[in-house]
Amino acid sequence: MSDFELEKALAAWRRALRRNPALDDGEATELECGLRDEFEELVAGGMDPGSAFQRALDATGSAADCGPEFYRAKRTRRSARPPWQAPRLVPPLVWSYVLTAVRKVRREKGYAFINIAGLAVGLACSVLMMLWVRQETSFDRFHIDGGSIYRLVTETKGPSAVTRDARAPTPTGPAVKAEIPEVVDFCRYRTNKNYGIRLGDKALYDAVIGIADPSFFAMFTFPFLKGDPKTALGDPRSIVVTESVARTFFGADDPMGKVLTIIRDPYTVTGVIRDVPENSHLRFACVIPAVNMHEYHHVDFDSWNSMFFNCYVRLAPGASPAAAAAKMTRLVAGRLGRPNIGILAQPLKDVHLKSDFAFDLDNHARGSASTLTLLSLAAAAILLLACINFMNLATARSANRAKEVGLRKVTGARRSDIVRQFLNESVVLAFIGLALALLLLWAALPLFNGLAGESIAFAQLADPGLLAAVLAVTLLAGLLAGSYPAFYLAAFEPARVLKGNFFAGERGRAALRKGLVIVQFALTVFFIAGVLIVDKQLRFVRTKALGIDTRQVVTTTVRSERHREAVLADPRILAASISAPPGLAMRAAVDVAWDGKDPQDRTPFFPVPVDPGYLETFRAGMAEGRFFSRELASDRTDAVVVNQTAARVMGPGSPVGKRLTLTAMSMEGTTETRTYAVIGVMKDIHQSSLRRAIEPTIFTWDLGPWLNLRIDPNGVPETIAFLEKTWKSFVTEFPFTYEFLDDRYDAFYKQDRRTRSILGVFAALALFSACLGLVGLASFVAERRTKEIGIRKVLGASAHGLVLWQSWGFLAWVLAANIIALPAAYYAADRWLRSFAYRVEPGIGPALLAGAFSLAVAFLSVAYKAVQAARSNPIDSLRFE
């Protein structure tokens, strides 16, 4: 240690000490004096200089230790950590990257805002869709045996179309359990909202009552608070209620063994379950045994022509659903004697999202898998737009960081270090964007719930799995956004950068930016054009002639002809009909035969019960012949009217006068065969949404449970009050309920309107994100071309010409995006339009409107910066040249 040099060692320690931001010069000098004194004492004691200096240094403290100690001494909170020092759980290098990213945000606020705002919007949309997807895909997942439960769907193949019915023939469940080994159990189920539940003066008239086989609670997992799920529905007059219903009628008392009244019959409470979860397609306030339907609706449980229930089966472990469905098809088709009948096994988990069948349960809002997929892709596209903005602006402004990269490389940084630094910076910005995204989501979630008809709660984000997915998406977005800039900047050659030759090869970078802008606006134009085409179709379905006038028609339930006559006594009631109103799900198909019918023709005909007031009430028209008349008693028993579609199926020539033989297959199980004479042909009526083609229909004089009234458009509230008063004179145990016919037709397209609205919002957000990026690029170009603009102004260029010159390049990119996006948008829209039997031709209008709008918005985005640059004084940019 004889060659130890004290001054050199002190100089090195002093330099490290003075780099510490917690120490001022006086404190550093004081520490140095203390170190010298300690060193001299140790040397005087006989220690060699090198060891003495090390011992003194240990006693005084290293430069890294002294800084935090002095920092804490100056703070009232003794545990405070210096802001430049990494938190205890964060590696120092990562903390350095975080600080660099924060400084960059402070230094370039405008560009940081564009990046963070874009990422925040994209992440907010993505997190929203993750919440929605999680909620929609959680339906019916809580049942213990849910993976082996299937709903049976009846498929009927006609000559031109295939119809699917969510019900199955009533005896299907017992038959398949007895004859098909794969079927372990079955349960038939349906709901009714018209029975009501009563106990003395208390009543729940609008309660949804489930009607099921005794196996219902053994097959489906609804936790019991009281009672035995295996025996709860064993007695025909037993009832299982939810805890809310039990609380409503019995308060804190034990409901077991108590009696509730449904219709006029007593039912004994044999079980209490927890309230049905929101994510269940089986929704009810109580459940009663299905056997009562023989009494209430004359259901024939042994008739294969009876279609009254949804039927669920539970398959054995390892059983093939396809093989079981094939066996069930053979069984049902054989019992019915109809080879065009098939049975599909729909997984329980698919019922909520993948059900577009006739006679489906209508007491819950069905979802749409295609809508969910479409909106998820839209959210992902908006996030991609934000990532493209980040890439574009980072590469465009790479000149500002070129020397930093060059110096880092000269001082020993490897390429991987540079890549890691820039990736970390982009990830930090992504997580800052996530924080802002969560604030946006919290504020916007109530608006989205109202728009989509959902009940998504912000608190659902506390779910560990979902939270992990959100963090993973944010991390991936940060890595994606920073990937190209990181590798691009890391590839800089220090010598060329430090010599000022950075802009060599700018043409390649400009081409990349051009491509990314085109991708951005292509996605945006795709959304805009798609929304415009969807809107055009929805306007078409709203204005298309339906064959009837749905305005000012009120539908309610009816008890008798006397009820109809009582309301007709009021002059505000213009017409009345006891019939199945248009817009209601049609009855089960009937077999129809006539002279000359092709034996291979299996076209289903659908019966509709009407009375002579039907034409006047709904303002339908006759194409040929006449309608039913109260003056002719034979019309009630021997006559039918067919629609134009049925007349075409029956062949050329007039069907009036022909004899039709009907074999009924009603939901009550009627199998009677009768012959009628065709007395007229009614003009076609759209009985359902325009997604379905008009079916061959037979109108019979057969009173239904609905009273349809055409009312005077003046004084509607008074008319409704009169109808309620009249109702109460006939019915005392149930409240008066009614529905306007146009509301029922309007509900057919409720989901489509919601999808259009959400897509419209997403299109606006996509446009916002794309324009943010365009504004950033325009600012960069204006900065880069400041001297060129000054020279052009000196040479006589006008401000107007300079604005067009600067804007043209961007507009050309947007025009190219239109050329790419519009064909794709029309193709996607055509696929959606095919779901409608009656649809509009998109035409060129949406393309022109989307193109013009995108070009106009793009021009306005770049024009602001272009005008600023064009109006600048050329002296400011050329004074030093």
Per-region residue spans from a language model:
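Negatively charged linear elements and acidic catalytic determinants
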Residues: 1-107, 504, 874-881
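Alpha-helical transmembrane segments of integral membrane proteins
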Residues: 81-113, 361-364, 393-431, 442-559, ...
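Small-residue-rich transmembrane alpha-helices
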Residues: 124, 128-131, 344, 427-497, ...
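A hydrophobic alpha-helix feature that marks transmembrane segments and, especially
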Residues: 127-130, 377-405, 480-486, 532, ...
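Hydrophobic, regular-secondary-structure patches
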Residues: 136, 145-208, 215, 244-252, ...
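Mid-to-C-terminal secondary-structure elements
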Residues: 194, 210-226, 237-370, 565-751
